């Protein structure tokens, strides 16, 4: 496959008991946050109760600043010293243009709501806009700096610190390995898209092409889909979505890069990037049936990519690492149930 390839048997570091078996109680942030809004009389629920194909899915773009602060306060999963950990809802951007409602834009209000007073709170690590999962905040600049140095050192040493859970449409050929690809950002039709580059030259690297690397491990398979753990070893926008599309197994709910995977007579192949525009992910009838979704509902399917675990250094050099965990969103758990995907 030219500039990208899968290498068998990734190095260790996988968390073996993630507690991600799909159960009706794995609500993540959804239930508490929704009840918080309902008590405030919010008039913007996602769908009528009982008719929700994506339970627990919030739409941050419809919230007022006050409502978003309520949701984020209810999404706190851990607070210790200067560190606060949130379980970010899918669809909430961390940064954005001036005037846009983002995590950064409400940090002052959130800080006061959490009792941190006027201390400046920094985002140390966060899942991307379309992904759900962990956000690590710090009210201490020295702690934030120490953690940033730890993450940078870990990347250089090829030691994973973040583990994502993903449901993929398709099953990787190997059960465990590495995905390597040279990627670049390209402005196409007014949108910044990640584009793979085969055999990049030194000039390409100088002009912004980056060699990227991710580990993956297949946890379970069923109904032509897979539950996959992903560990990025480099930092690049939409890296995990682009990597899984290159493996012909796009992430469920990826309405940007899944269009690059074509199918003829049951065989999947990569379509030319230059002639493939982002579009709503198309799922076959059998998969729609297993998910109990109509085609129009599938067009609103959220990205099933969740930052589940962050690995942090201990307080002292000889202390064991600390693991922060964020429960899966309810809609993610529902998908696992529908597809019969369970952690073994």
UniProtKB/Swiss-Prot annotation:
Taxonomic lineage from the root: Eukaryota, Metazoa, Chordata, Craniata, Vertebrata
Biased composition (Basic residues): 32-42
Organism whose genome encodes this protein: Bos taurus
Compartment(s) where it occurs, according to its Swiss-Prot or TrEMBL record: Mitochondrion matrix
Any one GO molecular function term: RNA binding
Transit peptide per record: 1-41
Keywords linked to the UniProt accession: Isomerase, Mitochondrion, mRNA processing, Phosphoprotein, Transit peptide
Known EC number: 5.4.99.-
Segments for region (Disordered): 29-59
Name assigned to this protein: Mitochondrial mRNA pseudouridine synthase RPUSD3
InterPro entries: PsdUridine_synth_cat_dom_sf, PsdUridine_synth_RsuA/RluA, RluA_PseudoU_synthase
Record text on subunit structure and interactions: Forms a regulatory protein-RNA complex, consisting of RCC1L, NGRN, RPUSD3, RPUSD4, TRUB2, FASTKD2 and 16S mt-rRNA.
Gene assigned in the entry: RPUSD3
GO biological process, one term: positive regulation of mitochondrial translation
Residues with Phosphoserine modification: 64
UniProt keyword annotation of Ribosomal protein present: no
Domain of life according to the entry: Eukaryota
Any one cellular-component term (Gene Ontology): mitochondrial matrix
Protein family (similarity comment): Belongs to the pseudouridine synthase RluA family.
Coiled coil residues, start to end: none
Catalysed transformations (reactions): a uridine in mRNA = a pseudouridine in mRNA
Function text: Catalyzes uridine to pseudouridine isomerization (pseudouridylation) of specific mitochondrial mRNAs (mt-mRNAs), a post-transcriptional modification necessary for their translation. Acts at position 390 in COXI mt-mRNA and at position 697-699 in mitochondrial COXIII mt-mRNA. As a component of a functional protein-RNA module, consisting of RCC1L, NGRN, RPUSD3, RPUSD4, TRUB2, FASTKD2 and 16S mitochondrial ribosomal RNA (16S mt-rRNA), controls 16S mt-rRNA abundance and may play a role in mitochondrial ribosome biogenesis.
């Amino acid at each position: 496959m030219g500039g990208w390839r899968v290498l068998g048997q990734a190095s260790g570091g996988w968390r073996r008991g993630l507690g991600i078996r799909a159960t009706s109680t794995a609500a993540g942030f959804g239930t508490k946050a929704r009840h918080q809004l309902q008590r405030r009389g919010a008039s913007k629920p996602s769908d009528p109760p009982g008719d929700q194909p994506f339970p627990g899915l919030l739409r941050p773009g419809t919230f007022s600043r006050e409502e978003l602060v309520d949701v984020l306060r209810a999404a706190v999963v851990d607070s210790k010293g200067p560190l606060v950990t949130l379980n970010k809802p899918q669809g909430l951007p961390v940064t954005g243009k001036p005037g846009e409602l983002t995590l950064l834009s409400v940090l002052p209000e959130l800080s006061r709501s959490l009792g941190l007073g006027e201390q400046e709170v920094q985002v140390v690590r966060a899942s991307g806009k379309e992904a759900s999962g962990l956000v690590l905040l710090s009210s201490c600049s020295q702690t934030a700096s120490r953690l940033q140095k730890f993450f940078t050192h870990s990347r250089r040493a090829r030691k994973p610190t973040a583990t994502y859970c993903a449901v993929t449409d398709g099953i990787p050929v190997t059960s465990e390995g590495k995905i390597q690809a040279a990627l670049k950002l390209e402005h196409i039709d007014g949108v910044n898209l990640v584009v793979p580059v085969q055999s990049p030259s030194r000039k390409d690297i100088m002009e912004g092409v980056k060699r990227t690397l991710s580990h993956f491990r297949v946890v379970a398979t069923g109904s032509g889909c897979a539950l996959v753990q992903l560990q990025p070893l480099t930092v690049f926008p939409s890296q995990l979505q682009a990597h899984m599309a290159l493996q012909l197994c796009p992430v469920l709910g990826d309405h940007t890069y899944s269009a690059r995977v074509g199918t003829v007579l049951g065989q999947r192949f990569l379509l030319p990037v230059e002639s493939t525009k982002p579009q709503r992910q198309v799922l076959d009838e059998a998969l729609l049936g297993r998910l109990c979704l109509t085609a129009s509902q599938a067009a609103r399917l959220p990205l099933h990519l969740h930052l589940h675990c962050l690995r942090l250094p201990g307080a002292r050099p000889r202390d064991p690492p600390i693991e922060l965990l964020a429960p899966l969103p309810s809609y993610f758990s529902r998908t696992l149930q529908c597809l019969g995907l369970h952690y073994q």
